[in-house]
From Swiss-Prot:
Protein name in the entry: Cyclic pyranopterin monophosphate synthase
EC number: 4.6.1.17
Entry keywords, A to Z: Lyase, Molybdenum cofactor biosynthesis
Active-site residues, Swiss-Prot/TrEMBL: 129
Known role: Catalyzes the conversion of (8S)-3',8-cyclo-7,8-dihydroguanosine 5'-triphosphate to cyclic pyranopterin monophosphate (cPMP).
Paired cysteines (S-S): none
Taxonomic lineage from the root: Bacteria, Bacillati, Bacillota, Bacilli, Bacillales
Catalytic activity: (8S)-3',8-cyclo-7,8-dihydroguanosine 5'-triphosphate = cyclic pyranopterin phosphate + diphosphate
Organism: Listeria monocytogenes serovar 1/2a (strain ATCC BAA-679 / EGD-e)
GO MF annotations, alphabetized: cyclic pyranopterin monophosphate synthase activity
Length: 160
């Protein structure tokens, strides 16, 4: 795509929301991932339920789902969409890294990549917020789109 072909600019080179009126509704799915690194003790306390603010993973899961539904309120040119599925899962390395994965699905005229990315980002920020009293050095890294399906551009899978 050429610079002049960017779709979020009008004829005056000012920002606009893309017109999706004539696009067909199709099933669209996106998976995103983010990893938060922390001290071993922090991860152990999360799993043991010994964080003062509560069940970290349950709260982060709900925060991620809420974020997916609110993405258009945070990202200026994102269309409001009807999210038909939003799920957050967690996997850790048993030491210091906790990976957050989101899956977001819709049947609509525009994709859900931003919703999936927003979901993992907010889930990671929620974990940071709930654990920062004991570990201010946590790092949120490697936030990326893992896969997307549906729509005119078809399927995308990130390189491993």
């Amino acid at each position: 795509m050429e610079k002049d072909d960017l779709t979020h600019f009008n004829d005056e080179k000012r920002a606009k929301m893309v017109d999706v009126t004539s696009k067909s509704e199709t099933k669209r799915r996106a998976i995103a991932s983010a990893t938060i690194h922390m001290n071993e003790e922090t991860l152990a306390r999360i799993h043991a339920g010994k964080i003062a603010k509560g069940d970290v993973l349950a709260v982060a899961q709900v925060a991620g789902i809420m974020a997916a539904k609110k993405t258009s309120e945070l990202i200026p040119m994102c269309h409001p969409i009807m999210t038909t599925k939003a799920d957050i899962s967690f996997e850790d390395d048993g030491k210091t890294a906790l990976t957050i994965t989101s899956e977001v699905v819709t049947v609509g005229k525009t994709g859900v990549e931003m919703e999936a990315l927003t979901a993992v980002t907010i889930a990671a920020l929620t974990i940071y917020d709930m654990c920062k009293a004991m570990d201010k050095g946590m790092r949120i890294e490697k936030t990326y789109l893992v896969e997307k399906t549906g729509g005119k551009s078809g399927t995308f899978k990130a390189e491993a």
